[in-house]
Amino acid sequence: MSKYRKIADNISVNEYSLSKFKNLECAIFDCDGTLVNVNRSYNACIKKTVGFMLERLIGGKQWYDLVSDELILKLRMSGGFNNDTDTSYTCILSALASGSKDVDTARNFALHVATKANYQGIRSVEEYLTKSGNGDAVKKAKNDLNYPGLVGSSILSTVFDEFFYGKDLFLKMHRMQPRFNNSHGFIDNDEVVISDDTVHDLSKLFKKKMAIVSGRSRLAIEYSLKKMLRNFNLDASIFIEDEEKEVIANHLQIRVNKPEPYALLKAMKALNARSAISIGDSAEDIIMSRKVGEKYPTVFCGVYGTGIDSDAQFKMFMDRDVDAIIENVNLLPVLLRSTIK
C-alpha cells in the first residue's frame, strides 16, 4: 500500500510527513528545474560545450551528439552534479576514457560511468575511472581542461560560461572579453515556470520569508527572473556559483556546493528561521535538505514536471521517501493549504 496520499491532481504527500508541515517559518527554492525550465538552456549548453571541447581535444564533429538527456539525468540523479560544468567535465572525461572515436560507443561508456557516480560528484567519477585502469585519461582531462578552475584559467569553465551567458553577460559577469562565443547565450532559452500569482501567494503565506539557494550566479538569477525577485529575500539567497568562486580564489577549505548543507543553513540563518520547506528537483536537493533536517525541522518538496524525464523523476522522489511531490511549483500553495489546516 502506498505511503503517499494524493491530495489534489499532481500533488502527493507522504503520510508519515503530514505533521512536519505545521509551523514552517520559511520557504527556500532551488532555481533550475524548479523556478525555471532549463532543458533548452543549461542542458543544451552542456551538449554544446562537450562537443566543442572534444572537437578541440581529439577532433571530430560527432562529439556534438555525445551527450543525451538520459546521460544528464543519470548524473543529476546521483546527487553530486548540481554544477553543470562538472557534468560537462564528466562527459568529456568519460569520452576520453572510452578510448573510442565512435560516439555511440563513447556514450554507452559514459552512461556506464554515470551509474558509478555518487553524491561526491566528479571525485567519485575520477576515483572509479582511476581504479578501473583509466588514470591516464583522468590526468589528461585535468591537465588539458585545467579543471576544476576559474573562468580565465580553466578553458572548460571559460567555454561553458561563454556559451551560457553570451557575449554581453559574460563580459559583465567576468570583466573579460569572450574568446569562443561572440553571440547570444543559452540563458536566453530559460523558461520561467513560477507565476507572479504563485510568488505573491507564497510571499503572504511565509510573511516574505522566502529565499533562493541555487547553483547559479546572482547575475543569472536576476537576468531570468527579473522583477519577480522582489518577493524573494536576495540578501538571504545563496548563489553557489558566486560563493564557489570566492572559495577557490581565497583557497578556503569550505564545501559550498549541493548536497552539502552549507547554502541552505546559511539562507535559513539569514532569514532568522529555525524551520523550512525546501523545494527542488534533484537528488542533491534531497540530500542537502536531510542534512539540514538533522539540526532543524525541514520539509522537502520535490518538483518533477519540468525535468528531462518526469516519470523517472517522480519515481526517484517516491523511492527516496520525500515529504511531498508536486508536478509544478505553482501547485505549492495548494499543497501548503492542504497540509497546514
Residue ranges and their predicted role:
Residues K226, S278-I325:
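Acidic, Mg2+-coordinating phosphoryl-transfer loop and its flanking beta/alpha structural elements
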